[in-house]
Amino acid sequence: MISPNVETFIGCDSSYRAADIVLYGAPFDSTTSYRPGARFGPSAIRHESFGLETYSPYQNADLTDFDIFDSGDLELCFGSSEAALADIEARAAEILRDGKLPLLLGGEHLVTLGAVRAVAEKHPGLHIIHFDAHADLRDDYLGAKLSHACVLRRCHEIVGDGRIHQFCIRSGERAEFEFAAQHTEMHKFDFTGLAELTEQLCATKEPVYLTIDLDCLDPSCFPGTGTPEAGGVSFLQLLDAIRTVSKANIVGADLNELAPMLDISGVSTATACKVLRELLIALDKGWPGFQVSQKII
Protein backbone atom coordinates (compact mmCIF):
# COMPACT_ATOMS: atom_id res chain seq x y z
CA MET A 1 0.00 0.00 0.00
CA ILE A 2 1.25 3.51 -0.84
CA SER A 3 2.44 5.46 2.21
CA PRO A 4 0.99 8.85 3.25
CA ASN A 5 2.71 12.07 2.22
CA VAL A 6 3.87 14.61 4.82
CA GLU A 7 2.87 17.74 2.88
CA THR A 8 -0.37 17.18 1.00
CA PHE A 9 -2.47 19.30 -1.31
CA ILE A 10 -5.16 20.95 0.79
CA GLY A 11 -8.20 18.77 1.39
CA CYS A 12 -6.54 15.56 0.15
CA ASP A 13 -6.46 13.91 3.56
CA SER A 14 -8.23 10.63 2.92
CA SER A 15 -6.54 7.31 3.63
CA TYR A 16 -5.23 5.45 0.60
CA ARG A 17 -7.64 2.58 1.20
CA ALA A 18 -10.70 4.87 1.18
CA ALA A 19 -9.60 7.13 -1.69
CA ASP A 20 -11.29 7.31 -5.09
CA ILE A 21 -8.58 9.57 -6.55
CA VAL A 22 -4.85 9.33 -5.82
CA LEU A 23 -2.65 12.35 -6.51
CA TYR A 24 1.03 11.62 -7.23
CA GLY A 25 3.79 13.98 -8.31
CA ALA A 26 6.52 13.65 -10.94
CA PRO A 27 9.10 16.42 -10.34
CA PHE A 28 10.91 15.94 -13.65
CA ASP A 29 12.02 18.43 -16.32
CA SER A 30 15.18 16.91 -17.78
CA THR A 31 14.11 17.31 -21.43
CA THR A 32 12.95 20.93 -21.13
CA SER A 33 14.04 22.70 -24.31
CA TYR A 34 13.55 26.36 -23.36
CA ARG A 35 13.07 27.46 -19.73
CA PRO A 36 13.53 24.82 -17.00
CA GLY A 37 11.88 24.70 -13.59
CA ALA A 38 8.80 22.50 -14.00
CA ARG A 39 10.32 19.97 -11.60
CA PHE A 40 9.51 22.43 -8.82
CA GLY A 41 5.84 22.58 -9.82
CA PRO A 42 4.38 19.79 -7.66
CA SER A 43 5.94 20.99 -4.40
CA ALA A 44 5.07 24.63 -5.15
CA ILE A 45 1.43 23.74 -5.79
CA ARG A 46 1.16 21.80 -2.54
CA HIS A 47 2.78 24.58 -0.53
CA GLU A 48 0.65 27.30 -2.14
CA SER A 49 -2.54 25.33 -1.60
CA PHE A 50 -2.62 26.26 2.07
CA GLY A 51 -3.61 29.77 1.01
CA LEU A 52 -6.58 28.37 -0.91
CA GLU A 53 -9.99 27.36 0.38
CA THR A 54 -11.11 23.77 -0.07
CA TYR A 55 -14.54 25.03 -1.17
CA SER A 56 -15.24 25.75 -4.84
CA PRO A 57 -17.91 28.39 -5.47
CA TYR A 58 -17.75 27.42 -9.16
CA GLN A 59 -18.99 23.90 -8.45
CA ASN A 60 -20.62 24.36 -5.04
CA ALA A 61 -18.51 21.55 -3.62
CA ASP A 62 -15.65 21.13 -1.19
CA LEU A 63 -12.54 18.97 -1.50
CA THR A 64 -13.32 17.57 1.93
CA ASP A 65 -16.60 16.18 0.53
CA PHE A 66 -14.54 13.59 -1.35
CA ASP A 67 -12.02 10.84 -0.63
CA ILE A 68 -8.74 11.99 -2.18
CA PHE A 69 -5.27 10.76 -1.20
CA ASP A 70 -2.04 12.67 -1.93
CA SER A 71 0.84 10.19 -2.12
CA GLY A 72 3.51 12.87 -2.62
CA ASP A 73 6.25 12.99 -5.23
CA LEU A 74 8.10 10.10 -6.79
CA GLU A 75 11.88 10.02 -6.46
CA LEU A 76 12.86 10.08 -10.12
CA CYS A 77 16.15 9.55 -11.93
CA PHE A 78 16.99 12.87 -13.57
CA GLY A 79 19.71 11.29 -15.71
CA SER A 80 17.41 8.86 -17.50
CA SER A 81 14.08 9.76 -19.04
CA GLU A 82 13.21 6.11 -19.57
CA ALA A 83 13.93 5.23 -15.94
CA ALA A 84 11.77 8.14 -14.78
CA LEU A 85 8.94 7.09 -17.09
CA ALA A 86 9.18 3.51 -15.81
CA ASP A 87 8.76 4.73 -12.23
CA ILE A 88 5.75 6.86 -13.20
CA GLU A 89 4.22 3.93 -15.07
CA ALA A 90 4.72 1.61 -12.10
CA ARG A 91 3.03 4.02 -9.68
CA ALA A 92 0.10 4.60 -12.04
CA ALA A 93 -0.29 0.85 -12.55
CA GLU A 94 -0.36 0.27 -8.80
CA ILE A 95 -3.07 2.90 -8.32
CA LEU A 96 -5.12 1.41 -11.16
CA ARG A 97 -4.79 -2.13 -9.78
CA ASP A 98 -6.29 -0.86 -6.54
CA GLY A 99 -9.34 0.44 -8.40
CA LYS A 100 -8.53 4.14 -8.07
CA LEU A 101 -8.12 7.05 -10.49
CA PRO A 102 -4.49 8.22 -10.83
CA LEU A 103 -3.97 11.99 -11.14
CA LEU A 104 -0.39 12.89 -12.02
CA LEU A 105 1.10 16.26 -11.10
CA GLY A 106 4.08 17.31 -13.25
CA GLY A 107 6.69 18.22 -14.06
CA GLU A 108 7.27 18.66 -17.76
CA HIS A 109 4.84 17.13 -20.22
CA LEU A 110 6.95 14.06 -20.99
CA VAL A 111 5.78 12.58 -17.67
CA THR A 112 2.38 11.96 -19.29
CA LEU A 113 3.86 9.11 -21.33
CA GLY A 114 4.58 7.00 -18.25
CA ALA A 115 1.02 7.37 -17.01
CA VAL A 116 -0.52 6.72 -20.43
CA ARG A 117 1.46 3.49 -20.75
CA ALA A 118 -0.12 2.18 -17.55
CA VAL A 119 -3.63 3.47 -18.26
CA ALA A 120 -3.67 2.11 -21.83
CA GLU A 121 -2.60 -1.30 -20.54
CA LYS A 122 -5.46 -1.30 -18.04
CA HIS A 123 -8.04 0.25 -20.37
CA PRO A 124 -7.82 -0.93 -24.02
CA GLY A 125 -9.38 1.45 -26.53
CA LEU A 126 -8.18 4.49 -24.58
CA HIS A 127 -8.84 8.01 -25.89
CA ILE A 128 -6.60 10.93 -24.90
CA ILE A 129 -7.96 14.46 -24.55
CA HIS A 130 -5.10 16.94 -24.68
CA PHE A 131 -5.21 20.63 -23.65
CA ASP A 132 -2.01 22.43 -24.68
CA ALA A 133 -0.52 25.39 -26.55
CA HIS A 134 1.80 23.00 -28.39
CA ALA A 135 1.10 20.01 -30.62
CA ASP A 136 3.89 17.91 -29.03
CA LEU A 137 3.83 15.68 -32.12
CA ARG A 138 7.46 15.85 -33.24
CA ASP A 139 8.95 12.47 -34.04
CA ASP A 140 12.11 13.57 -32.28
CA TYR A 141 13.62 16.72 -30.83
CA LEU A 142 17.31 17.15 -31.66
CA GLY A 143 17.50 13.38 -32.07
CA ALA A 144 15.74 12.54 -28.81
CA LYS A 145 12.57 10.46 -29.08
CA LEU A 146 11.75 11.01 -25.40
CA SER A 147 11.15 14.74 -25.14
CA HIS A 148 8.34 16.96 -23.95
CA ALA A 149 8.09 18.05 -27.60
CA CYS A 150 7.37 14.46 -28.68
CA VAL A 151 5.12 13.17 -25.92
CA LEU A 152 1.86 13.02 -27.89
CA ARG A 153 3.67 11.37 -30.81
CA ARG A 154 4.80 8.62 -28.44
CA CYS A 155 1.28 8.39 -27.02
CA HIS A 156 -0.07 8.02 -30.55
CA GLU A 157 2.15 4.97 -30.97
CA ILE A 158 0.23 3.45 -28.04
CA VAL A 159 -3.40 4.39 -28.78
CA GLY A 160 -3.39 4.77 -32.58
CA ASP A 161 -5.22 6.96 -35.07
CA GLY A 162 -8.28 9.01 -34.17
CA ARG A 163 -7.91 8.54 -30.42
CA ILE A 164 -5.97 11.69 -29.53
CA HIS A 165 -8.12 14.83 -29.37
CA GLN A 166 -6.12 18.06 -29.11
CA PHE A 167 -7.45 21.47 -28.05
CA CYS A 168 -6.02 25.01 -27.79
CA ILE A 169 -3.09 24.12 -30.06
CA ARG A 170 -1.44 27.23 -31.44
CA SER A 171 2.22 26.32 -31.87
CA GLY A 172 4.26 23.65 -33.63
CA GLU A 173 6.20 22.77 -36.74
CA ARG A 174 4.43 22.38 -40.08
CA ALA A 175 5.18 18.65 -39.97
CA GLU A 176 3.31 18.32 -36.67
CA PHE A 177 0.17 19.89 -38.10
CA GLU A 178 0.45 17.68 -41.19
CA PHE A 179 0.78 14.62 -38.95
CA ALA A 180 -2.24 15.73 -36.93
CA ALA A 181 -4.35 16.09 -40.07
CA GLN A 182 -3.82 12.40 -40.77
CA HIS A 183 -3.64 10.83 -37.32
CA THR A 184 -5.15 12.94 -34.51
CA GLU A 185 -8.19 15.16 -34.06
CA MET A 186 -6.79 18.66 -33.63
CA HIS A 187 -8.85 21.69 -32.61
CA LYS A 188 -6.72 24.81 -32.85
CA PHE A 189 -6.78 27.84 -30.54
CA ASP A 190 -9.64 27.01 -28.15
CA PHE A 191 -12.13 24.37 -26.96
CA THR A 192 -14.43 24.43 -29.99
CA GLY A 193 -15.78 20.91 -30.50
CA LEU A 194 -15.13 19.68 -26.95
CA ALA A 195 -18.79 19.48 -25.94
CA GLU A 196 -19.67 17.45 -29.03
CA LEU A 197 -16.70 15.12 -28.50
CA THR A 198 -17.68 14.60 -24.87
CA GLU A 199 -21.24 13.67 -25.88
CA GLN A 200 -19.87 11.07 -28.29
CA LEU A 201 -17.54 9.59 -25.67
CA CYS A 202 -20.32 9.52 -23.10
CA ALA A 203 -22.50 7.58 -25.52
CA THR A 204 -19.81 4.95 -26.14
CA LYS A 205 -18.50 4.95 -22.54
CA GLU A 206 -14.98 4.52 -23.89
CA PRO A 207 -12.13 5.21 -21.43
CA VAL A 208 -10.53 8.66 -21.56
CA TYR A 209 -7.22 10.02 -20.29
CA LEU A 210 -7.13 13.80 -19.76
CA THR A 211 -3.79 15.59 -20.01
CA ILE A 212 -3.57 19.32 -19.27
CA ASP A 213 -0.50 21.37 -20.09
CA LEU A 214 -1.07 24.63 -18.25
CA ASP A 215 0.49 26.61 -21.09
CA CYS A 216 -2.87 26.26 -22.80
CA LEU A 217 -3.63 29.30 -20.64
CA ASP A 218 -2.73 32.73 -21.96
CA PRO A 219 0.58 34.08 -20.58
CA SER A 220 -1.29 37.13 -19.29
CA CYS A 221 -2.72 34.91 -16.54
CA PHE A 222 -0.11 32.14 -16.54
CA PRO A 223 3.42 33.32 -17.43
CA GLY A 224 5.19 30.80 -15.18
CA THR A 225 5.74 28.02 -17.68
CA GLY A 226 8.65 26.79 -19.75
CA THR A 227 7.34 27.75 -23.20
CA PRO A 228 4.62 30.41 -22.96
CA GLU A 229 2.56 31.10 -26.09
CA ALA A 230 0.42 34.19 -26.67
CA GLY A 231 -3.20 33.70 -27.67
CA GLY A 232 -4.24 31.22 -25.00
CA VAL A 233 -7.49 30.61 -23.18
CA SER A 234 -8.60 32.14 -19.88
CA PHE A 235 -8.86 30.44 -16.50
CA LEU A 236 -12.66 30.41 -16.77
CA GLN A 237 -12.55 28.87 -20.24
CA LEU A 238 -10.25 26.12 -18.95
CA LEU A 239 -12.49 25.51 -15.95
CA ASP A 240 -15.55 25.21 -18.15
CA ALA A 241 -13.67 22.74 -20.37
CA ILE A 242 -12.69 20.64 -17.35
CA ARG A 243 -16.27 20.58 -16.15
CA THR A 244 -17.46 19.58 -19.62
CA VAL A 245 -15.00 16.75 -20.20
CA SER A 246 -15.49 15.35 -16.70
CA LYS A 247 -18.81 13.91 -17.91
CA ALA A 248 -16.84 11.34 -19.91
CA ASN A 249 -15.39 8.10 -18.55
CA ILE A 250 -12.15 9.63 -17.24
CA VAL A 251 -9.83 6.85 -16.04
CA GLY A 252 -6.66 8.91 -15.53
CA ALA A 253 -5.45 12.50 -15.76
CA ASP A 254 -2.51 14.83 -15.32
CA LEU A 255 -1.73 18.51 -14.83
CA ASN A 256 1.72 19.76 -15.75
CA GLU A 257 4.20 22.47 -16.83
CA LEU A 258 4.04 24.96 -13.96
CA ALA A 259 7.56 26.40 -13.53
CA PRO A 260 7.01 28.50 -10.40
CA MET A 261 10.38 30.27 -10.36
CA LEU A 262 9.60 31.86 -13.73
CA ASP A 263 6.80 33.95 -12.20
CA ILE A 264 8.03 35.78 -9.11
CA SER A 265 4.58 37.29 -8.58
CA GLY A 266 3.24 33.87 -7.61
CA VAL A 267 0.19 34.32 -9.82
CA SER A 268 0.96 31.25 -11.93
CA THR A 269 1.31 29.00 -8.90
CA ALA A 270 -1.92 30.33 -7.41
CA THR A 271 -3.68 29.71 -10.72
CA ALA A 272 -2.31 26.16 -10.95
CA CYS A 273 -3.57 25.47 -7.41
CA LYS A 274 -7.04 26.61 -8.32
CA VAL A 275 -7.06 24.56 -11.52
CA LEU A 276 -6.04 21.48 -9.53
CA ARG A 277 -8.77 22.05 -6.95
CA GLU A 278 -11.40 22.34 -9.67
CA LEU A 279 -10.03 19.32 -11.53
CA LEU A 280 -10.12 17.12 -8.43
CA ILE A 281 -13.70 18.11 -7.66
CA ALA A 282 -14.87 17.70 -11.26
CA LEU A 283 -13.30 14.26 -11.63
CA ASP A 284 -14.80 12.82 -8.48
CA LYS A 285 -18.08 11.24 -9.55
CA GLY A 286 -19.33 10.89 -5.97
CA TRP A 287 -21.10 14.25 -5.73
CA PRO A 288 -24.66 13.88 -7.13
CA GLY A 289 -25.34 17.61 -7.19
CA PHE A 290 -22.59 18.44 -9.69
CA GLN A 291 -24.09 19.76 -12.95
CA VAL A 292 -21.43 20.10 -15.63
CA SER A 293 -23.89 21.70 -18.03
CA GLN A 294 -24.06 24.91 -15.97
CA LYS A 295 -21.90 27.43 -17.79
CA ILE A 296 -19.64 29.73 -15.80
CA ILE A 297 -18.62 32.08 -18.60
Where are these regions (language model features)?
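Conserved alpha-helical scaffold segments that buttress catalytic/binding sites
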Residues: 1-297
